[in-house]
């Protein structure tokens, strides 16, 4: 139990460190229960996946509260309106409509709202793999790809979730499940920051009942942890199958995030 607790506090501590860099606050600000509003200044070590050139507003809900960062005038408006609002229902439609109204005069709108997952305290150790996954794993061969080998998949839309080919967040690890020469599934990790590497996964339609996705995500997470970095996983609010993959692979929801974009 003490090992589980140690692992859980390691993940929580890492999340506080990472979100502090992403939201221009301190790790203590992330860990407490108060809302924090900061002016965005790019920090060394921030996550850079699909990074916008200018961040005018983004909001994280973590530990039941809000982290808000962006340009001074928009953050000031958010502070006025949301200083004492809790995080639990913040991404419900009523609030999102209200936020869009606040953003409209600034020429902004909501772009995405996503949940993000971290390894659960139970860990991602191979000894934790359910026997069903281990027997399934024997049904296919595992192939690992390093950063250079991943380049062969550029432009291959079968693996659009596994590899993003984002120059700011390079794809650094890949793992495929192969049977009879066919790739059944591919998991990839992008180095979104020095501390946090994001896992993406593609699985062929006919392999979805074989636990290929959760096996690959769990094994890739082990490889990432072995490098001294933290694996994380993001998906859509309504992508239940993807959330189930994360859960079966030993991940649990840790925070949710909203980003904005210019109205074109």
What role is predicted for each listed range?
Residues 1-5:
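Short, small-residue-biased leader/transition segments that mark boundaries at the very start
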Residues 13-151:
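Acyl-donor-binding surface of acyltransferase catalytic domains
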Residues 66-69, 224-236:
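Conserved GNAT acetyl-CoA-binding A-motif
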Residues 110-119, 252-264:
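Conserved catalytic-core motifs of GNAT/GCN5-like acyltransferases
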Residues 166-172, 178-179, 183-196, 200-204:
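A conserved beta-strand-loop-helix scaffold within acyl/acetyltransferase catalytic domains
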Residues 233-247, 252, 261:
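Conserved beta-strand-loop-alpha-helix junction that forms the acyl-donor binding cleft
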């Amino acid at each position: 139990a003490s090992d589980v607790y140690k692992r859980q506090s390691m993940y929580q501590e890492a999340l506080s460190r990472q979100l502090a860099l992403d939201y221009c606050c301190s790790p203590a600000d992330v860990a407490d229960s108060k809302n924090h509003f900061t002016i965005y200044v790019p920090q060394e070590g921030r996550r850079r996946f699909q990074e916008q050139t200018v961040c005018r507003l983004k909001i994280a809900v973590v530990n039941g509260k809000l982290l808000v960062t962006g340009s001074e005038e928009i953050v000031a408006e958010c502070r006025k309106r949301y200083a004492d609002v809790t995080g639990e229902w913040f991404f419900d439609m009523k609030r999102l409509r209200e936020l869009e109204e606040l953003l409209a005069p600034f020429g902004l709108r909501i772009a995405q709202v996503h949940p993000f997952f971290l390894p659960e305290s139970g860990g991602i150790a191979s000894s934790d793999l359910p026997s069903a996954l281990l027997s399934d794993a024997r049904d296919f061969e595992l192939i690992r790809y390093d950063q250079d080998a991943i380049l062969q998949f550029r432009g291959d839309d079968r693996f659009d979730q596994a590899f993003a080919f984002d120059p700011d967040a390079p794809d650094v690890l890949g793992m495929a499940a192969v049977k009879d020469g066919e790739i059944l599934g591919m998991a990839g990790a992008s180095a979104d920051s020095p501390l946090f590497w994001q896992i993406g996964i593609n699985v062929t339609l006919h392999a979805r009942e074989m636990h290929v996705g959760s096996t690959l995500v769990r094994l890739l997470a082990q490889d990432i942890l072995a490098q001294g970095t933290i694996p994380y996983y993001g998906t859509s609010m309504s992508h239940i199958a993807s959330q189930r993959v994360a859960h079966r692979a030993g991940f649990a929801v840790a925070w949710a995030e909203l980003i904005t974009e210019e109205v074109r």
